[in-house]
Amino acid sequence: MNLMNPEFAMPDVQSTVDTRQMPIQRVGVRAVRHPLTVRTAEGETQATVGTWNLDVHLPADQKGTHMSRFVALLEERGGPLTADAFRTMLATMLEKLEARAGRIEVSFPYFVNKTAPVSGVRSLLDYEVTLTGDVRDGLTRVFAKVLVPVTSLCPCSKKISQYGAHNQRSHVTIDAELAADVPVEDLIRIAEEEASCELWGLLKRPDEKFVTERAYENPKFVEDLVRDVARRLDADERIVAYVLEAENFESIHNHSAYALIERDKRRGA
């Protein structure tokens, strides 16, 4: 039997008509691990591994989508994944899947080679990054989300104590809708500069002295942290909207302190 002969063509069940007349808002593949490259702030490329979610809108009369085409899209993609490249990838997906709406999300670890503040020793620090692209009603939107670990030191603890103050590791999460390409490191830098102190992968004793004193001289409540980062995001014209979170893993409690600011600059809110 020659399966390539039209006389023996294999049936394509997914392309048949569905009589239930129920559209599906999102259908596709999730948790696909696939390599990618991203561009650093210095213009170089960094190789990493992404966990991808891809989906499209399915009309009411169509039984199924073309599942294999999602993975084929990842296989064909090349070059660093910038905001512009992400928009192109979204358009290509809609064309391949014959869809009018769709969404791509990829999460990956991103590494920054940081220099210790006193000794100058260099070490890598990892950050969690998620890029999301969404096409709906003819509008394409691209989001960059990054989780930045930092140090926070309590102003109240410092004020009431004769010496010392409680401090802890904190997470600043910036989820920004982009009007233009924004390097991941720009968002990281904003969060780190507004914290009591940033983190490093490797520190020598002179560096530990520096970060201890730096945090002590720059105390911040979780409210201070989220407001100071928000002020920086407000001033950045490349960002049109954001959801900003700060969470302090309190060293003197068994719970966290948390704050959130959400703003869409297009609405002036």
UniProtKB/Swiss-Prot annotation:
It is an enzyme of class 3 (hydrolase). The keyword Hydrolase applies. Its EC number is 3.5.4.16. One of its GO terms (biological process) is tetrahydrofolate biosynthetic process. It holds the Pfam family GCHY-1. InterPro entries: GTP_cyclohydrolase_FolE2 (IPR022838), GTP_cyclohydrolase_FolE2/MptA (IPR003801). It catalyses: GTP + H2O = 7,8-dihydroneopterin 3'-triphosphate + formate + H(+). The record marks 154 as: May be catalytically important. Keywords: Hydrolase. GO terms for molecular function: GTP cyclohydrolase I activity. Pathway: Cofactor biosynthesis; 7,8-dihydroneopterin triphosphate biosynthesis; 7,8-dihydroneopterin triphosphate from GTP: step 1/1. Converts GTP to 7,8-dihydroneopterin triphosphate. Belongs to the GTP cyclohydrolase IV family. HAMAP family: GTP_cyclohydrol_B. This is GTP cyclohydrolase FolE2. It comes from Burkholderia pseudomallei (strain K96243).
